Curated annotation (Swiss-Prot):
Residues 1-24, 79-122 are cytoplasmic. Keywords: Membrane, Transmembrane, Transmembrane helix. It is found in: Membrane. One of its GO terms (cellular component) is membrane. It comes from Saccharomyces cerevisiae (strain ATCC 204508 / S288c) (Baker's yeast). The lineage of its organism: Eukaryota, Fungi, Dikarya, Ascomycota, Saccharomycotina. This is Uncharacterized membrane protein YOR376W. It is a multi-pass membrane protein. The chain crosses the membrane at residues 25-45, 58-78. It comes from the Eukaryota. Residues 46-57 are extracellular.
Length: 122
């Protein structure tokens, strides 16, 4: 029963890539939607194209390079009225999580708190 509940909480896994002139990193995000809050876990790794090395996305090598985890707790008020703080990761284009599980490409500059994609719990 608990395993089934946990599997229902994991709604979406997506890859986010920031499209700047020289991308600094790629990020993989895991979204967990709980009753009163949501948790986004971002795993960020440096883009090795900057260093001229071949990029290898195997999980063991990512851990060897130093994986940085970011957790974002989204209270009920923010879930209903506020977006994911995407300006932490990219200031141009980003794929955002919508409440129905779809992905939307934003084309604005720095992500404002006044509008954008809301994350809503189950």
């Amino acid at each position: 029963m608990k395993n089934r509940k946990f599997s229902n909480l994991l709604l979406l896994r997506l890859r986010i890539l920031c499209f700047n002139k020289k991308p600094a990193f790629a990020a993989t995000s895991y979204a967990f939607f709980f009753r009163n809050f949501s948790v986004l876990i971002f795993i960020m790794v440096p883009d090795e194209k900057e260093n001229g090395a071949a990029a290898d996305n195997s999980f063991s090598l990512l851990i060897g390079r130093g994986v940085v985890l970011f957790l974002f707790y989204c209270p009920t008020a923010l879930k209903m009225h506020g977006p994911v703080p995407a300006h932490w990761f990219c200031d141009k284009n980003i794929e955002a999580i919508q409440s129905d599980g779809q992905i939307r490409l934003l084309r604005s500059g720095p992500f404002p708190w006044s509008h954008g994609t809301c994350i809503r719990g189950a």
